[in-house]
């Protein structure tokens, strides 16, 4: 195959009639008795037809007539992903976490809008990445496109949807709230990020999304782990994308891809993965190992609001601290103690002056942690400052059948050594929960390529050294550091850490800044 004058594609095939009878702007230019040479006018429509005929390597027209706007140049794998999306009205993107698939989708959306193929786009994603991933990436890539975030009250959501912005971002649980408004709007492209959130077709969430997808709707589903726990996880995704491809019910589908071992135990059939692979097409996937042009370490922010219980206690504490702020005798030590209390609330448990522990509902943060773990193809390190929270997380993750270990100040040196050795050498995907100070120096843990900060530290040295446990000699994959934040003190600290200021900043000044908003 070759491109001629940026206008036509030359293809060699044993069956030229398959092309010339379907594509009007094509002609047979040579036939040697076995193989024909066909010239095809290079347009978006002909590319899609050729892909459907099996010529999947035919490049998208985005390659010849798009300027790739934005503040940075796309990586090769991002260009390939954008090309793929533009060429496929219904498609899956299975690129691994940290490979920049949101930017690739943004460019594809913009290109289709410039061609007047897509009128408006609806991005459906978790609340935690509405701003930190989608809004930020859209601003960096297609800043000329008006973007609105449909979040807040029902009226606020409706106002954004009914406005004239090109791209609307909404979280999964917000869809049902304004479903009628969304249905009446003219979205003809729907992008579902972290699509495993709609893997069950019996949920209200799936049913709401399904009402937005019409036969002529462009639909792109994005996830790094399409069937992480079970082949059945693919059912809801495929039914939304191509309902004709799957059984009528999830139970029938389960029977097709799994077999029953005992009353409560099912196992995948030998051919299940191959069957799922055939169903979930067309698809594209890049792992971080394949993306040779990626930076060695990537930073992400996941915004996870505090639960109502946490927010109430956090606000009460902050108000009390604000009252004492006028006291000139307050010191950096007092500030550090108070700031630590706020961090404890956000983390899920507060230590009282008598040593007791008050637990808080931190369900949303835990769900986000599970999402991140599911997205990662390798083991994961989770840094958490508080011992009680580590114990809570270990119990919850173990209950979800993850292989989990923990290291904190109460773990002996010999036991730590055994845990680190097992983590490095087992070859299994594991979760290691660590107090940052317990493994911030001299330990190699590059069996992981994802680090999660459940809550921030106040020391840049600790932050940098802890991240270096994964990003060090011997690491063969690009690494991702995910900062989870849900309150003012966390946002301020992460910003200071990323600006490498926390070893020098005025702790008292930062504390005052946090309380004053």
Predicted regions located by residue number:
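Accessory DNA-engaging acidic/polar modules
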Residues: 1-72
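Conserved pre-motif I regulatory segment
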Residues: 61-94
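Conserved Helicase C-terminal RecA-like lobe
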Residues: 96-99, 104-117, 122-125, 294-318, ...
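Conserved P-loop NTPase motor "coupling/switch" region that bridges the ATPase
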Residues: 120, 147, 163, 189, ...
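Conserved helicase motor
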Residues: 128, 148-157, 172-177, 199-203, ...
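Conserved helix-turn-beta segment of the N-terminal RecA-like "Helicase ATP-binding" lobe
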Residues: 130-153, 241-244
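SF2 helicase motor core recognition
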Residues: 175-180, 229-231, 390-394, 416-420, ...
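A conserved SF2-helicase RecA2
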Residues: 458-517
């Amino acid at each position: 195959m070759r491109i001629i004058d940026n206008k036509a594609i030359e293809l060699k095939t044993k069956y030229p009639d398959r092309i010339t009878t379907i594509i009007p702007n094509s002609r047979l230019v040579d036939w040697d008795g076995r193989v024909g040479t066909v010239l095809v006018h290079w347009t978006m429509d002909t590319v899609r037809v050729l892909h459907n005929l099996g010529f999947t390597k035919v490049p998208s027209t985005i390659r010849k007539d798009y300027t790739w706007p934005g503040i940075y140049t796309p990586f090769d794998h991002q260009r390939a992903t954008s090309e793929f999306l533009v060429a496929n009205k219904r498609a899956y993107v299975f690129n691994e976490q940290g490979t920049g698939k949101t930017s690739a989708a943004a460019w594809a959306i913009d290109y289709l809008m410039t061609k007047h193929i897509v009128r408006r786009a609806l991005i459906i994603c978790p609340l935690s990445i509405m701003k930190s991933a989608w809004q930020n990436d859209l601003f960096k890539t297609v800043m000329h496109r008006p973007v609105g975030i449909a979040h807040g009250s029902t009226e606020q959501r409706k106002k954004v949807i009914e406005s004239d912005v090109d791209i609307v971002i909404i979280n999964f649980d917000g869809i049902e709230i304004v479903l009628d408004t969304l249905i009446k709007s003219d979205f003809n492209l729907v992008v579902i990020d972290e699509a495993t959130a709609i893997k069950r077709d019996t949920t209200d969430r799936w049913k709401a999304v399904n009402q937005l997808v019409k036969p002529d709707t462009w639909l792109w589903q994005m996830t790094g782990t399409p069937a992480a726990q079970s082949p059945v996880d693919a059912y809801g995704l495929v039914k939304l994308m191509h309902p004709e491809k799957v059984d009528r019910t999830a139970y029938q589908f389960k029977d097709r891809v799994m077999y029953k071992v005992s009353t409560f135990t099912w196992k995948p059939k030998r051919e299940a993965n191959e069957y799922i692979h055939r169903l979930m097409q067309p698809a594209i996937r890049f792992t971080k190992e394949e993306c040779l042009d990626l930076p060695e370490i990537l930073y992400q922010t996941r915004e996870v609001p505090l639960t109502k219980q946490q927010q109430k206690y956090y606000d009460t504490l902050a108000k009390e601290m604000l009252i004492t702020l006028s006291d000139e005798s307050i010191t950096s030590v007092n500030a550090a103690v108070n700031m630590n209390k706020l961090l404890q609330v956000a983390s899920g448990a507060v230590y009282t002056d008598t040593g007791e522990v008050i637990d808080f509902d931190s369900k949303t943060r835990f769900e986000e942690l599970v999402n991140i773990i599911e997205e990662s193809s390798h083991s994961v390190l989770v840094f958490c400052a508080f011992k009680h929270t580590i114990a809570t997380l270990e119990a919850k993750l173990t209950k979800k059948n993850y292989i989990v270990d923990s290291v904190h100040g109460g773990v002996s040196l010999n036991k730590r050594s055994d845990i680190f050795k097992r983590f490095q050498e087992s070859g299994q995907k594991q979760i290691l929960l660590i107090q940052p100070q317990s493994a911030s120096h001299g330990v190699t843990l590059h069996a992981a390529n994802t680090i999660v900060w459940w809550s921030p530290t106040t020391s840049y040295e600790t932050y940098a050294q802890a991240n270096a446990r994964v990003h060090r000699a011997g690491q063969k994959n690009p690494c991702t550091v995910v900062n989870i934040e849900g309150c003012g003190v966390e946002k301020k600290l992460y910003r200071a850490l990323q600006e490498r200021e926390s070893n020098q900043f005025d702790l008292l000044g930062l504390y005052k800044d946090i309380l004053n908003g």
